[in-house]
């Protein structure tokens, strides 16, 4: 079938999809070298088998990720706050706090996004330089501007999952 019909392939960069069951959902330290090795391994496993397929349009990244919303009382910020100060992400978090003492903590999401998207782009392009990177599928109600701005240098497009029954023309015009 993959040789007869155009298709896209999803790559879940971090298991923070809104629809994932609790036992598969979780934040990761995107600054940790172990996470980065796993990310590269997962991207390679998905990309290499199909990189020569002419029917492949491109790759989507994490589907409907939680960026500002919490899940079971945890979100990106509380996750980084909980990391040991000497862990890779703990050091980045502490340095960011020191450099931005009066900034809203949610601004740190841009730092997470930049790291995640830069690493994912480099890995994907290493294994497949030819197909589109369609980026993450953002949820209309959880796509912070500062996160979206960080993805733009690393993708060819982004996708947005609408949340209302009626098409939100004003929202999409603004985007």
Tell where the protein language model's regions lie, with residue ranges.
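Hydrophobic faces of well-ordered beta-strands that scaffold small-molecule active sites
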Residues: 7-11, 57-61, 133-136, 156-160, ...
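Substrate-binding cleft/loops of secretory-pathway carbohydrate-active enzymes
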Residues: 2-3, 67-71, 134-171
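Generic structural signal for short, solvent-exposed loop/turn connectors between secondary structure elements
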Residues: 1-11, 96-109, 162-168
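Aromatic-lined substrate-binding rim segments of carbohydrate-active enzymes
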Residues: 1-51, 111-127, 153, 171-174
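Polysaccharide-binding and catalytic clefts of secreted carbohydrate-active enzymes
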Residues: 26-30, 52-148
């Amino acid at each position: 079938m993959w040789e007869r019909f155009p298709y896209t392939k999803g790559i879940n960069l971090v298991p923070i999809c809104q629809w994932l069951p609790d036992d598969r959902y979780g934040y990761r330290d995107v600054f940790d070298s172990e996470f980065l090795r796993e990310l590269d391994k997962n991207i390679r496993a998905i990309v290499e088998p199909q990189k020569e397929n002419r029917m492949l349009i491109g790759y989507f990244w994490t589907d409907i990720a939680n960026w500002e919303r919490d899940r079971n009382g945890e979100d990106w910020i509380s996750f980084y706050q909980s990391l040991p100060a000497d862990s890779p992400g703990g050091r980045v978090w502490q340095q960011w706090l020191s450099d931005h003492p009066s900034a809203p903590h949610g601004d740190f999401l841009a730092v997470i996004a930049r790291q995640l998207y830069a690493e994912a782009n480099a890995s994907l392009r290493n294994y497949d330089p030819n197909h589109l990177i369609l980026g993450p599928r953002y949820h209309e109600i959880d796509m912070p501007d500062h996160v979206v701005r960080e993805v733009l240098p690393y993708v060819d497009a982004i996708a947005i999952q609408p949340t209302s029954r009626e098409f939100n023309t004003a929202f999409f015009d603004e985007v």
